[in-house]
Amino acid sequence: MKQYLDLMKKVLEEGTAKDDRTGTGTRSIFGHQMRFNLQEGFPLVTTKRCHLRSIIHELLWFLNGDTNIKYLHDNGVSIWDEWADENGDLGPVYGKQWRAWGSADGRHIDQLTQVLEQLKGDPDSRRIIVSAWNVGELDKMALAPCHAFFQFYVADGKLSCQLYQRSCDVFLGLPFNIASYALLVHMMAQQCNLDVGDFVWTGGDTHLYNNHLEQTHLQLSREPRALPKLVIKRKPDSLFDYRFEDFEIVDYDPYPGIKAPVAI
C-alpha cells in the first residue's frame, strides 16, 4: 500500500489549506488516482490495523438496501452512529440508491441487480455503472454520498472497477473505502465466474483533517508490510446472500491501530 502512503505525503506537502463543512479545517488536493492489482493481494492498509468487521458488515448492509443502523449495531459496528437520527435512520443513503433508486415514473430501480445482469449478458458494455448521487434526494440524506459513482469493466476474463469519490478523508475513511470496494469486486467476480482485475480509485477533494496530522506523520514513519489475501469460503446463490462468516483475511500483519477523531 505504498501508493496510499504516497498520497498522504502528497497531501501534506502540496495540500491547500481549506475550510470545510465540519469546521475542522483540512489540507486538500483535487484529483488523484490509485490503481490496485487485486491479483497481488487484498488492499488492506498494513501501517495501522483496520477494523475488518466494520468494513464487511457495512458492505453487507449496503447490499441489503438497508439505511437504518440497527443491523450495524447488532453486529458491533458504530461507524454511522454520529449521523443517524433518534430512530437510527439515515435517510435514502447508499443502500437505498444502490437497490431502490426512485425513478421519475415511480419505479424503484435495483442498480446492483442490473449490473449483475449486464456483467453476465453484456460484459463489454460501457454502461455498467452504479450511482449513489441522487440529486433529487440529497437533502433527505443524513450525509451526502462521498463514494458516489462506480463503473465495472471486463477484459481478458477479469473484472475491474473504478470508483469516483467526490470527498475523501484520507486518514480515517480511505482505507475503509479501498477495502470495501475491493471486497465488492471479489464478490461480483465470483458471482459472474470472472477473475479479479484492478480496483481503480479516483478522488475529488482529497484531504487530511487538521486534527489528523500528527497521526498521519506516525503512519508515514511505518514501513508497509506484505498485503494479506482474501478467502471467500463459499459461493452463495446471489450477491445478496453473503454472510460475514463467508470471508476470511489471511496473513494480515498490521501495525497497531492509530486513533483519530471523526469530523462530523
From Swiss-Prot:
Alphabetized Gene3D superfamilies for the sequence: Thymidylate synthase/dCMP hydroxymethylase domain (3.30.572.10)
EC class (word): transferase
Molecular function via GO: thymidylate synthase activity
Keywords: Cytoplasm, Methyltransferase, Nucleotide biosynthesis, Transferase
Pathway stated in the Swiss-Prot or TrEMBL entry: Pyrimidine metabolism; dTTP biosynthesis
InterPro entries per the UniProt record, alphabetical: Thymidate_synth/dCMP_Mease, Thymidate_synth/dCMP_Mease_dom, Thymidate_synth/dCMP_Mease_sf, Thymidylate_synthase, Thymidylate_synthase_AS
CDD domains, sorted: TS_Pyrimidine_HMase (cd00351)
SUPFAM superfamilies recorded: Thymidylate synthase/dCMP hydroxymethylase (SSF55831)
EC number: 2.1.1.45
Residue sites binding (6R)-5,10-methylene-5,6,7,8-tetrahydrofolate per the record: H51, D169, A263
Main localization of the protein described in the UniProt heading: cytoplasm
GO cellular component: cytosol
One GO process term, biological-process aspect: dTMP biosynthetic process
Quaternary structure (record): Homodimer.
Function (record text): Catalyzes the reductive methylation of 2'-deoxyuridine-5'-monophosphate (dUMP) to 2'-deoxythymidine-5'-monophosphate (dTMP) while utilizing 5,10-methylenetetrahydrofolate (mTHF) as the methyl donor and reductant in the reaction, yielding dihydrofolate (DHF) as a by-product. This enzymatic reaction provides an intracellular de novo source of dTMP, an essential precursor for DNA biosynthesis.
HAMAP family, A to Z: Thymidy_synth_bact
Family statement drawn from the similarity comment of this UniProt entry: Belongs to the thymidylate synthase family. Bacterial-type ThyA subfamily.
Name under which the protein is recorded: Thymidylate synthase
Species whose genome carries this gene: Xenorhabdus nematophila (strain ATCC 19061 / DSM 3370 / CCUG 14189 / LMG 1036 / NCIMB 9965 / AN6)
This protein's encoding gene: thyA
